[in-house]
């Protein structure tokens, strides 16, 4: 009997592909009461195993994610999206901010060369070619007085 290769996406719940990028929901952080969304950009021209060009991991608390799900399932989110498109509003339909403090990165041996924290932001916005666009930003951040890691405007990497 031939040995079966391990499945690399065994924690994947779903995956949505776009041109040169994808987002997947994973169940590997449920024990921490978080939904894990991984946003990935890739280049098909690179050799297999080296195709990822950028990657942002977002961890949303399950209660917050369930509120977003309920808004989507009930049609409230779709109604708000239609209203935003009609009035030309540029606000996010949903936004989640998170990050990792510089002290935690240093303790884990993953400190940034500039010594800063890592900030991660995800937004659900009304799209121009499609109804929705899920966007993730990651980059160097600074902690404010409340302990929130903030991403400076225009800094970081954006998906898609």
Where are these regions (language model features)?
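Positively charged, low-complexity terminal tracts
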Residues: 1-160
